[in-house]
From Swiss-Prot:
The keyword Nucleus applies. Sensor component of the AIM2 inflammasome, which mediates inflammasome activation in response to the presence of double-stranded DNA (dsDNA) in the cytosol, leading to subsequent pyroptosis. Inflammasomes are supramolecular complexes that assemble in the cytosol in response to pathogens and other damage-associated signals and play critical roles in innate immunity and inflammation. Acts as a recognition receptor (PRR): specifically recognizes and binds dsDNA in the cytosol, and mediates the formation of the inflammasome polymeric complex composed of AIM2, CASP1 and PYCARD/ASC. Also acts as a tumor suppressor independently of its role in inflammatory response. Able to suppress overt cell proliferation in enterocytes: restricts stem cell proliferation in the intestinal mucosa in an inflammasome-independent manner, contributing to a decrease in the likelihood of colorectal cancer development. AIM2 suppresses cell proliferation by inhibiting phosphorylation of AKT1 at 'Ser-473', preventing AKT1 activation and AKT-mTOR signaling pathway. This is Interferon-inducible protein AIM2. Belongs to the HIN-200 family. It is found in: Cytoplasm; Inflammasome; Nucleus. Changing residue 335 to A: Impairs DNA binding. Impairs DNA binding. Disulfide bonds: none annotated. CDD domains: Pyrin. Changing residue 46 to D: Impaired homooligomerization. Defects in AIM2 may be a cause of microsatellite unstable colon cancers. InterPro entries: DAPIN (IPR004020), DEATH-like_dom_sf (IPR011029), HIN-200 (IPR040205), HIN200/IF120x (IPR004021), NA-bd_OB-fold (IPR012340).
Length: 343
């Protein structure tokens, strides 16, 4: 499947820009890919694609190319490349998509097996502090988790879970809910597409997630996933700084330094509301800067006025021309919090 990503990187991406546009594209590669400028100076399109893939892998190379195209305002090309990537993503999912759980897999014995796997993971030998830096780096690379379907069990602490809501798909209406979980090292936003699991996602509860998808910035739990209560002796000691970071609203000047595609949750003050035919545009601000939000126009968002606050969940950092923008997606939610009336 990686060959498909290589193909669209070259044929849909780099082959469709002019020599002058390629030079501008190369300007950003040394930072995005950590490629020496000397190697890029005389490189043709095939050589550029090869360097990118060697440095970051085919999938990451495509995603970063989309971001650079957006940064350069090659919006049509960015859109085409994104569409082709999504087609390949769907093909990959259809190949790797796990089958629904059988009765045997849902049995207590299967649950016990998952817990045994977790116990083995916890008992795995750790890297000695006396290991050389080069060896530590190799171990870290071996242990790094790739995006996609994950069989490995993940013990986490639930930090937050929101109410289920309905969203539209080509197959009709479906239900899901958002959650936030954390390990001892990091936190994750989670899309949960099985609302029967809502009683598992209780704040401060330790659970084990298996057969889930890992994406850039979030986890996906669906009907084929397993979510179990951890054993009473299983602990996930989440540091306070991770808990705090998971729940805080990012500052706008921080968002302006993040890569396109970053998932954003938070509470923001509205400075201006502009209604469009199908969408609604909010100008947000905090004490560090300003940013636009493009949301779906509905009864709730149309009630929003200057001075109100909006709580955004699963919005995506994107670009509209030269402006950074937070954009609503199929699984995004927005809640309007009216400002208190002055007495």
């Amino acid at each position: 499947m990686e060959s498909k990503y290589k193909e669209i990187l070259l044929l849909t991406g780099l082959d469709n820009i002019t020599d002058e546009e390629l030079d501008r594209f190369k300007f950003f590669l040394s930072d995005e890919f950590n490629i020496a400028t000397g190697k890029l100076h005389t490189a043709n399109r095939i050589q550029v694609a090869t360097l990118m893939i060697q440095n970051a892998g085919a999938v990451s190379a495509v995603m970063k190319t989309i971001r650079i195209f957006q940064k350069l305002n090659y919006m049509l090309l960015a859109k085409r490349l994104q569409e082709e990537k999504e087609k390949v993503d769907k093909q990959y999912k259809s190949v790797t998509k796990p089958k629904p759980l059988s009765q045997a897999e849902m049995s207590p014995a299967a649950s016990a097996a998952i817990r045994n796997d977790v116990a083995k993971q916890r008992a795995a030998p750790k890297v000695s502090p006396h290991v050389k830096p080069e060896q530590k780096q190799m171990v870290a690379q071996q242990e790094s988790i790739r995006e996609g379907f994950q069989k490995r069990c993940l013990p986490v602490m639930v930090l937050k879970a929101k109410k289920p809501f309905t969203f539209e798909t080509q197959e009709g209406k479906q239900e899901m809910f958002h959650a936030t979980v954390a390990t001892e090292k990091e936190f994750f936003f989670v899309k949960v597409f099985n609302t029967l699991l809502k009683d598992k996602f209780i704040p401060k509860r330790i659970i084990i997630i298996a057969r889930y998808y890992r994406h850039s910035g979030f986890l996906e739990v669906n009907s084929a996933s397993r979510v179990l209560d951890a054993e009473s002796d299983q602990k996930v000691n989440v540091p306070l700084n991770i808990i705090r970071k998971a729940g805080e609203t990012p500052k706008i000047n921080t968002l302006q330094t993040q890569p396109l595609g970053t998932i954003v949750n938070g509470l923001f003050v509205v400075q201006k509301v502009t209604e469009k035919k199908k969408n609604i545009l909010f100008d947000l601000s905090d004490n560090t800067g300003k940013m636009e939000v493009l949301g779906v126009r509905n009864e709730d968002t149309m009630k929003c006025k200057e001075g109100d606050k909006v709580r955004l969940t699963f919005f995506t950092l994107s670009k509209n021309g030269e402006k950074l923008q937070l954009t609503s997606g199929v699984h995004s939610t927005i809640k309007v919090i009216k400002a208190k009336k002055k007495t």
